[in-house]
């Protein structure tokens, strides 16, 4: 059976690999198709498409939009756009707006850190960023500059920039679920709720209903929760049960299924771990064609 992976990240957001490196890795894993779904970025999609030509692998153009909604007390709700037109101006403008807001948030965090005595400048940190600018970039900069103070990136988060810590600031770089779905549809794409199992089950089911009521097309049923979400405390068998549960939800509601391993890099290798049949992509394409 041919397999695919419809959630992959590159250096255009918070992944470790260049587009070319990700394609090579997917080929090594024997995948038939992968989707490039960087967080609030489409910067690697065309590079991957061009490199993959004549190499026997399909590239699905995509994006993972950072959304939220006042009805749900989650830090972020990820919405995948698959088969999107990366040249769509409205989608590009929305992504530009999100990243502008994100940069402003990071400037304010850095000002707080400077006020606490840390020698850090926005432009110095930004220079090392290839994709979207996140708190991990600030943490890596501080770890490199102050190795005697911090033991790891996680240590920087725990002491300074994690939620509720001295230099943390709420970000306003989210769009509403409704606007995210509209932007994806406007770019000719299919809107998928990413990894619904990361939320408490009761809230997850409410979120799925809300997402679908606002025009969403389906949910990500295949996902390696046992690898990416240790806080769930499930093993491989438990993950299989999670997948079955969300597949049953998709079937009951007659909506699309998608699946991705959320690969970011070698620090947490997941590409191709969950076997996702090619038929999943065929079904998504069929729905898009309607």
Protein language model regions, located:
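An N-terminally biased module of ancient metal coordination in phosphate/nucleic-acid-related enzymes
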Residues: 1-76, 160, 164, 175-268, ...
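A broadly conserved amphipathic alpha-helix scaffold signal in soluble, globular proteins
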Residues: 46, 107-114, 140-143, 182
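Active-site phosphate-binding/coordination module
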Residues: 49, 64-100
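Conserved phosphoryl-transfer catalytic core
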Residues: 100-127
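Surface-exposed cleft-lining segments at the edges of enzyme active sites
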Residues: 124-128, 157-171
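Active-site glycine- and acidic-residue-rich loops that bind
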Residues: 128-133, 168-173, 197-202
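Glycine-rich, often acidic, oxyanion-interacting loops/wings at catalytic, nucleic-acid
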Residues: 133-141
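S-adenosyl-L-methionine-dependent methyltransferase catalytic core, i.e., the SAM/SAH-binding region
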Residues: 136, 148-161
């Amino acid at each position: 059976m041919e397999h695919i992976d419809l959630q992959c990240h590159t250096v255009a957001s918070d992944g470790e690999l260049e587009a070319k490196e990700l394609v090579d890795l997917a080929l090594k894993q024997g995948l038939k198709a992968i989707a490039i779904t960087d967080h609030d970025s489409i910067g690697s999609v065309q590079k991957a498409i061009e490199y993959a030509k004549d190499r026997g692998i399909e590239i699905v153009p995509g994006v993972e939009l950072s959304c939220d909604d006042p009805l749900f007390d989650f830090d972020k709700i990820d919405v995948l756009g698959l088969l999107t037109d990366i040249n769509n101006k409205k989608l590009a403008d929305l992504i530009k707006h999100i990243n502008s807001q994100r940069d402003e948030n990071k400037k304010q965090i850095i000002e707080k850190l400077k006020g606490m005595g840390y020698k850090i400048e926005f432009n110095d940190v930004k220079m090392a960023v290839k994709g979207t600018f996140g708190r991990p970039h600030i943490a890596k900069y501080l770890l490199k500059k102050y190795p005697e103070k911090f033991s790891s990136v996680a240590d920087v988060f725990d002491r300074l920039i994690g939620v509720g810590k001295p230099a943390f600031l709420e970000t306003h770089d989210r769009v509403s679920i409704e606007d995210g779905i509209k932007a994806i549809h406007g770019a000719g794409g299919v809107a998928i709720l990413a990894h619904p199992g990361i939320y408490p089950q009761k809230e997850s089911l409410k979120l799925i209903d809300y997402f679908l009521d606002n025009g969403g097309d389906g949910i990500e049923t295949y996902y390696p929760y046992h690898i990416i979400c240790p806080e769930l405390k499930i093993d491989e068998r438990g993950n299989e049960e999670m997948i079955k549960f969300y597949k049953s939800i998709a079937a009951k509601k007659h909506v699309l299924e998608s699946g991705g391993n959320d690969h970011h890099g070698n620090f947490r290798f997941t590409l191709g771990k969950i076997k996702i049949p090619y038929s999943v992509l065929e079904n998504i394409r069929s729905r898009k064609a309607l």
